[in-house]
Amino acid sequence: MKAIHWTIAATAFAFVQPTLASAATTDPEVIIYRFNGVRGLLGSAAPGTVFHCTNFSGANEMIRFVSRTQSGEIAGNHVLPISHLQTVTIVYGNIITYSVDLHLTLPSALTFQGSIAIAATSANMFCTAMVMETAEFAPVGIALRGIRFNPVPGSQE
């Protein structure tokens, strides 16, 4: 009798398929990074800023970029969907080094210098940022240090 029960249990386990986590695009947003030293001048060869973010949450998520001027006024608020294990590239300025998923826009054509907050529907993402020369095919620039908020549980950053 035990052999029959074990056979049934083994058969049941053989047909169970692993599934990805359900989409979390409706979860509340949490701030995951803040970067200062963000710079951009649209329509110019002046240095711009590029952000790369990767989602490893196991679900589709939403990522938001809220930029502020030197004086603290909101200069932009942009949202982008991001799939599991997808890397997105977001830029201020005319960066040609990378293919771009989202060009951040400014309310005017003035030089933008300030900070940006990155929020997402999951903390299971990581982002980097660089101020780069805009007319270069090779990445020429400096890395910006991001302050991490809401770290991934069980990680050290």
Residue ranges and their predicted role:
Residues 9-12, 152:
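Enrichment for repetitive, rod-forming helical segments
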Residues 20-157:
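Gly/Pro-rich, tryptophan- and cysteine-flecked surface segments typical
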Residues 13-21:
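C-terminal segment of classical bacterial N-terminal signal peptides
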Residues 1-8:
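Bacterial N-terminal signal peptides that target proteins for export
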